[in-house]
């Protein structure tokens, strides 16, 4: 009994829901189709029915399934249709001419703002046509085609410019009539030609000034180089002269130092002397006459005679060479010391030797040299 009662209670409690499900099946299909169409773009899965609570009208109080089903699709097309209308009314379509030129954009904005939302497209079309006309008119007025002059026209204009850079009005009218040009074209051409001439003259002046500056700089550099060269040559000449003087004084000092000890030493030093150097030394020492000159000559003559008379080779060798060396070293140095205390004085003094003494001296020297060579 209890089982049957519970079964009946459950059947009674579940019976209204089944009936409502059966009665609400057609609207559920409508809503299912509309929802599946919307969600098909998002998910490509199989068709899934909506939740059970949304399909039951009893769970949604104050709404009938038919009214709800019939009322839901109505606002959706209204919303979809009404959404572009305010967008079109608030934002009129933008054309490329509106972006490029400001004047056309300003003329197009007042009718668009004054027009209603429903008739927004009409004024836009009208303003577009008007703006195109305005743009064409403004473009034609502001942009002028460049005048293409012929060769004859340019030649005549250049000739006139060569004689007159500024034209008076009668002459300008005459040239325009001759060349089939307007007065304005002739005027503009002369203005442009004057500017060109001015630029050319300025460029030439700048080039000339630059060339002069470069030439001045080059000349200054050349002068500086010449001055440096002259200074360098002067320094070299001065240094060369100083070196010559120092070398000359050094030679004099060395000669005086070598001859001074030889003159003071009493012992005779025997060393071989070449004939040429002995002649030069004897000539230098016999520049000044002194009382010792005859003694030197007599001793040299006696020694030479003794050497010539002796036939033995030893006598020829020893006495003659020793006597000649004694004459060349001791007697001549004593003579130079007696005549002048220093060597430069004796070197710079004039020659006072007589012709007879010079011939005698050269003859004796040649005989001694010949004997020495024969031996």
Curated annotation (Swiss-Prot):
Cellular compartments annotated: Nucleus
SUPFAM superfamilies in the record: Homeodomain-like
GO cellular component: nucleoplasm
DNA-binding region(s), chain positions: 142-201
Main location: nucleus
InterPro entries, A to Z: HD (IPR001356), HD_metazoa (IPR020479), Homeobox_Antennapedia_CS (IPR001827), Homeobox_CS (IPR017970), Homeodomain-like_sf (IPR009057)
Example GO molecular function: DNA-binding transcription repressor activity, RNA polymerase II-specific
Superkingdom to which the source organism belongs: Eukaryota
GO biological process, one term: cellular response to retinoic acid
Record region (Disordered): 41-93, 197-228, 257-278
Keywords, alphabetical: Developmental protein, DNA-binding, Homeobox, Nucleus, Transcription, Transcription regulation
Antp-type hexapeptide (motif): residue ranges: 94-99
Keyword hit for Nucleotide-binding: no
SMART domains associated with the record: HOX
PANTHER family associated with the record: HOMEOBOX PROTEIN HOX-A2 (PTHR45664:SF3), PROTEIN ZERKNUELLT 1-RELATED (PTHR45664)
Family to which the UniProt record says this protein belongs: Belongs to the Antp homeobox family. Proboscipedia subfamily.
Function of the molecule: Sequence-specific transcription factor which is part of a developmental regulatory system that provides cells with specific positional identities on the anterior-posterior axis.
Protein name per UniProt: Homeobox protein Hox-A2
UniProt lineage: Eukaryota, Metazoa, Chordata, Craniata, Vertebrata
